[in-house]
């Protein structure tokens, strides 16, 4: 299974780094392919390095603008025109989407996949799993629930999103519900 992971390009607190490493090891040990944003630094570099060291297949998708910062040990690196095309390629290649902590770029990727789900542009069986390390996405979860309760977010979008407190819980969900 191709598991697309959205996460930060920046170095972050150790608790987030540990969860990224755990997720990457589980992806590799499960025989899955990691598909990620292609960057060689921050959490992106951590997940790629960890999956690679654990014997997993690593596929990067990176925009032309930052291709010089691409992860060098990827089994495959796809260079695309811009971040819009990068998001589409990441989403298209992933059988499931996993979201780790991140900033505006990660949030953009996440809301893009939710928009695609809302508009019927996403495979109906594609799951979105958000790893809620230390409650990082708790307010986002509450916002989605409020949007759903107020009629701004369709039930099928809510049903496609699963929040997991740990990478282990995320992978259990994926293994049980994945494509």
Language-model features and meaning:
Residues 1-56:
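Glycine-rich beta-alpha loop segments
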Residues 38-101, 105:
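Acidic/glycine-enriched connector segments
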Residues 42-46, 136-148:
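Glycine-rich, charge-decorated loop segments at or immediately adjacent to ligand/cofactor-binding or catalytic sites
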Residues 45-50, 109-120:
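Short Gly/Thr/Asp-enriched flexible loops that form oxyanion-binding sites at enzyme active sites
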Residues 62, 100, 116-141, 155-157:
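Short, acidic/small-residue loops that bind anionic groups at enzyme active sites
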Residues 96, 150-179:
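A charged, well-structured terminal subsegment
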């Amino acid at each position: 299974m191709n598991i697309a992971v959205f996460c930060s390009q920046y170095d972050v607190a150790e608790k987030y780094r540990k969860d990224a490493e755990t997720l990457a090891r589980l992806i590799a040990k499960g025989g899955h392919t990691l598909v990620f944003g292609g960057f060689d630094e921050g959490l992106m570099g951590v997940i790629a390095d960890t999956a690679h060291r654990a014997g997993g297949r690593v596929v990067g998708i990176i925009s032309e603008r930052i291709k010089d910062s691409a992860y060098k040990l990827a089994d495959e690196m796809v260079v695309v025109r811009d971040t819009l095309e990068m998001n589409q390629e990441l989403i298209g290649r992933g059988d499931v989407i996993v979201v780790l902590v991140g900033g505006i770029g990660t949030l953009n990727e996440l809301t893009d996949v939710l928009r695609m789900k809302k508009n019927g542009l996403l495979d109906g069986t594609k799951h979105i799993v958000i790893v809620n390390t230390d409650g990082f996405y708790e307010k986002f979860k509450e916002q989605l629930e409020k949007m759903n309760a107020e009629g701004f977010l369709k039930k099928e979008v809510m049903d496609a999103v699963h929040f997991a407190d740990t990478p282990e819980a995320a992978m259990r969900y994926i293994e049980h519900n994945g494509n």
